[in-house]
Amino acid sequence: MATLKPVMPSAASISISRRRWLRTTAATAAGALLSPLAQAAPRPGSLPREFRAAWMATVFNLDWPASPGLSPAEQQAQLIAQLDAAARLHLNALIFQVRPSGDAVYPSSLEPWSGFISGATGRSPGYDPLKFAVTEAHRRGLELHAWFNPFRARASKSHGPAGNHLATRHPEWTRSYGGGLWFDPGEPGVRQHTIRVIADVAQRYAVDGIHIDDYFYPYPPKGTSGMGASPFPDDATYARYGRGRDRAAWRRSNVNAFVSEMYAAVKKIRPSAKVGISPFGIWRPGVPTSIKGKLDSYEHLGADARTWLASGWCDYLSPQLYWSINPPDQSFATLLPWWHQQNRSGRHLWPGMAIDRIGAQRPAREIINQLALTRESAPRGRAGACHWALKGLRQNRGGIQEALLTGPYASRAAVPASPWLGAAIPEPPRAVCEGGILRIIPAADTRWIAVQTWDELEWQLAALLPPDMDSPMATIESRVPDNARRLALRTLSASGLESEALMVEIA
């Protein structure tokens, strides 16, 4: 192999042979001459950035698998089809539900296997779905965020608790409410157990994010206007721990303790993992003043999401803004800027959007318009959205696929950087092209290799290539995109920061 040849940083470009390893260095001065390639293809600007995620639910088999108890081969084929669909739509993240109801979509010593996967709580499906999902998502340039329901104990009577389910081991920590079984957030042991479960996944899996949904204290049963009409049965817990405080304030303090301690636990184990929360989209009725509604998530669910965002107890907040831009009672266009105003910590704000509500009364154009508003309201390079859910995208409701691919998702984008998770700018990769195969040696702290191609008009993000998680400095091989003559390669760090570009011409 040829000796490593230093070349100019991405302020310049170079034409490379098919058998020459290349690297960029910081040693060359800014006044160095550009090569003919640099004159023909301008230096690419910063990578396009936008968070494009979809929730992928396992509870009730909403997204995956199609039914409980399928063979590993059937489940894996279905999961690959889901991931392929996400990649074709130019998404860059999936929020994959791994804890539907005090159970696990992965082997765990803390909780039983989920019956939604294997057909019976506690029964193994014969493989590790989370490990498979992480590996296959990364192969497609997709982040994988592990999604936990923090306090639901049983979501379906068809899958009763197994012997090692927390509800079986500690029935005194559970409460029947609204037809379901719930862990009481006021019990310190419940909060500690849930944090241990989340920390265990952060420790054992190369997940890109940890995601908590909107079920804190449970929603009031249908047909009631709030907790006052059908109170959550936590009298005994309140008597032990409430210390005379207002009960709603005490409940909020329990949830706040869970959120802040969970965030700290994840950061201690996997600092670069993005912690996301997706609360109910209206903080309180009347806030802002034009917003109306019966449910008060602050009062009824113990969810003070404004405090979580302002305190920096999450890396991204995805309030579920499932309403249309019009009419004004729950207007997306009113709620989104209000949430941005609460973001004093400078975290990401990536609202949830309701793909499943596309229909006769809500065309796909509504989602396109909402995406335009998210781009207008977010700082440059920080926009994003989470789509509920992947199933609606795959079903192409209202022609949403075509609307996205001919509009806001026409080209790929990388996930926005989170510089508070690591501020060091990474070094560029090294590379050689031989026989149509691009071989890349990653730099230290590489999370992705971004490959851009020049189409004679503009630079396009062609791929995000992951390093080998077991051997992060191992050579990455990738076929050169068809008809590509010029490439730009960048390192993306664990926090999403990008290196200078290594400019490559395919001779």
Model-assigned labels for residue ranges:
Residues 2-14, 20-40:
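N-terminal export signals
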Residues 61-74, 151-200:
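Active-site-adjacent "subsite" loops/lids of carbohydrate-active enzymes
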Residues 77-102:
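Catalytic domains of carbohydrate-active enzymes, especially glycoside hydrolases
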Residues 106-118, 152-177, 214-240, 288-295:
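Aromatic- and acidic-residue-enriched segments that line the glycan-binding/catalytic groove
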Residues 204, 223-279, 283-287, 299-300, ...:
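Active-site neighborhood of glycoside hydrolase catalytic domains
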Residues 316-325, 347-415:
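Substrate-binding cleft of secreted/luminal carbohydrate-active enzymes
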Residues 437-443:
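Conserved aromatic anchor
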Residues 481-495:
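Beta-strand-rich modules
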